[in-house]
């Protein structure tokens, strides 16, 4: 445990660490849309240093570490870009996704941290996305967890693809991606972004199981703070002792329509 804790805290404390990412690209039926066209842009972390990092996107990649901070909703100061974010028309029942637009190594990066991803929807009051901070109710429509006892679905992948439930009530929503690395300590890194989407379809479903961000998660929730056998890169357990398939993600149950 001491070995894992030291490695974990050392990695997260390293300035300019490469293991960060942002998801500024929305995928619609497998088609890439322009970066930050439909996803709320986020602010830099700290001071921009053009002599060291000429691309400003690098400074958008650091995670949220306080799950009680309003930035956990859609990313760092994301509401500031709401008025210039366009809204994508999405057919209920179709496949959509988020693509990692930048990581520590450059454009079109990957999900660096071994851990799950989840997708939530929140209907904008009066279908007004420009004035909606995301402080209402969210329901979960997708989880990308483990595919085996030793491998996470998203780790080192470029995209997180999922399907909008067929009976989702039509209207304008914030669509939120979260990806994070569970740990054995009460500390986690969160990579969150939100897209503007207009869901078109027959409706008929009634979403259930709501969450709020911030508000629903705590640092010691199961799924955020986990046992050592659900940590891929601890260095303390052999592969055959890992049990990722026993992992239960935080938040409400999936709503599938």
Swiss-Prot record:
Cysteine-cysteine disulfides: 74-194
Instruction: Give UniProt keywords alphabetically.
Output: Carbohydrate metabolism, Cellulose degradation, Copper, Disulfide bond, Glycoprotein, Metal-binding, Monooxygenase, Oxidoreductase, Polysaccharide degradation, Secreted, Signal
The EC category is oxidoreductase
Catalysed reactions listed for this entry: [(1->4)-beta-D-glucosyl]n+m + reduced acceptor + O2 = 4-dehydro-beta-D-glucosyl-[(1->4)-beta-D-glucosyl]n-1 + [(1->4)-beta-D-glucosyl]m + acceptor + H2O
Which cofactors does this protein require?
Cu(2+)
Instruction: Identify the stretch annotated as signal peptide in this record.
Output: 1-19
Role according to the record: Lytic polysaccharide monooxygenase (LPMO) that depolymerizes crystalline and amorphous polysaccharides via the oxidation of scissile alpha- or beta-(1-4)-glycosidic bonds, yielding C1 and C4 oxidation products. Catalysis by LPMOs requires the reduction of the active-site copper from Cu(II) to Cu(I) by a reducing agent and H(2)O(2) or O(2) as a cosubstrate. Shows no activity on wheat arabinoxylan, konjac glucomannan, acetylated spruce galactoglucomannan, or cellopentaose.
Q: What's the name of the protein?
A: AA9 family lytic polysaccharide monooxygenase U
